[in-house]
Amino acid sequence: METIQQQKAALRRRLAAREQAMTRRERELSDRAIIYHVTRTEEYRRARTVFAFVGRGREIDTMPLLRQILADGKRLCVPLCTGKGIMEGGQVRDLSILRPGAYGIPEPPADAPEVARADIDLSIVPCAGASPEGWRLGRGGGYYDRFLARY
């Protein structure tokens, strides 16, 4: 019998294969649709401070979303790795300050103002897949799980 970790790993492989099979055009349309729907939710409209991941590789291109958050006058914070397995929200006012950090993921400089978790109204996190009940399947590193668990 497979362990839960083995089942999750197998599911991640299947989902990754699907993502890799997408054409560039399909990916662009999918990215736009996700961003369109996110920015039309009541949660987004009400949010004053938004924590959002910076997509890379197989993940959606979140740069248009990050630009929209700033254009809408919202306070933006993105992941900032502050230690092994520890991630906080670093405030960003200008996307040009983002530089490759841990694992090559663009993040703000270490001296960026840290946003208190209590101030974050909406979190937009990567998701490899989700259950019908809304349980998120991440990429396996646990950074976002640990971050979200502290809310």
Regions found by a protein language model. Give the residues of each.
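N-terminal active-site beta-alpha-beta segment that forms phosphate/nucleotide-binding
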Residues: 2-119
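Membrane-associated lipid acylation/remodeling enzymes share a hydrophobic transmembrane-juxtamembrane segment
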Residues: 133-151
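Mid-sequence acidic-hydrophobic segments that form the walls
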Residues: 108-112, 126, 150
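Well-ordered alpha/beta subsegment
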Residues: 114-120, 125, 129-134
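Short loop segments at secondary-structure junctions
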Residues: 93-95, 128, 151
